[in-house]
Amino acid sequence: MQENSPLLQLQNVGYLAGDAKILNNINFSLRAGEFKLITGPSGCGKSTLLKIVASLISPTSGTLLFEGEDVSTLKPEIYRQQVSYCAQTPTLFGDTVYDNLIFPWQIRNRQPDPAIFLDFLERFALPDSILTKNIAELSGGEKQRISLIRNLQFMPKVLLLDEITSALDESNKHNVNEMIHRYVREQNIAVLWVTHDKDEINHADKVITLQPHAGEMQEARYELA
């Protein structure tokens, strides 16, 4: 891939649910280090679009490219190691935080490195002792941070975020947002973030707005007044 070529490209992507047109003629690209938001009213297809980019569902029309290759021709497990998806409600499993953090290592058949765990816990303002904590005892903010750490350990090229702070209080929301922005800037990770949070617009390179009913889009560069 040439330097500064798009990591992701959506070309005329559409999605039908039965006879209902959810998305129509979606076209945009995402480059390394670029930060784009997806906004729009409820029911306009924001989460559906993110799931298509995450390769959790397939578009009914159009093409999704990753580094110039059609995602439908790539092995899903390889693609998802490069394009990481964080849902609005984090799904944690096993008994402890440690169980969740070793999972990315296990699927790669690699020996977990505790030093990496500890570095991420420090970055995301969590104590070392949380590794042995039962996931049922975690707060909403802690669960979301553990989910992010699990997804970021192997530095994906693209991070997909689906309203991940919508259920958090203002203090936790601010902390999680700042941690994400700081880390992705350091690592030059591309971000596609579905959100209703107007404060996040200040961080965006561009804002993709989906229209209701037809699921069509507009893309604009955000400029501070």
Swiss-Prot record:
Broad class of where this protein is predominantly found: membrane
GO cellular component: plasma membrane
Compartmental location: Cell inner membrane
Presence of keyword Ubl conjugation: no
Keywords assigned: ATP-binding, Cell inner membrane, Cell membrane, Ion transport, Iron, Iron transport, Membrane, Nucleotide-binding, Translocase, Transport
GO molecular function annotation: ATP binding; ATP hydrolysis activity
UniProt: ATP binding residues: 40-47
InterPro entries in the record: AAA+_ATPase, ABC_transporter-like_ATP-bd, ABC_transporter-like_CS, P-loop_NTPase
Domain ABC transporter: 8-225
SMART domains registered for this protein in UniProt: AAA (SM00382)
One Pfam family linked to the record: ABC_tran
Family designation: Belongs to the ABC transporter superfamily.
Subunit structure: The complex is composed of two ATP-binding proteins (FetA) and two transmembrane proteins (FetB).
NCBIfam families the record matches: PRK10247.1
Function: Part of the ABC transporter complex FetAB, which is probably involved in iron export and enhances resistance to H(2)O(2)-mediated oxidative stress. Probably responsible for energy coupling to the transport system.
Protein name: Probable iron export ATP-binding protein FetA
Source organism: Escherichia coli (strain K12)
Gene of this entry: fetA
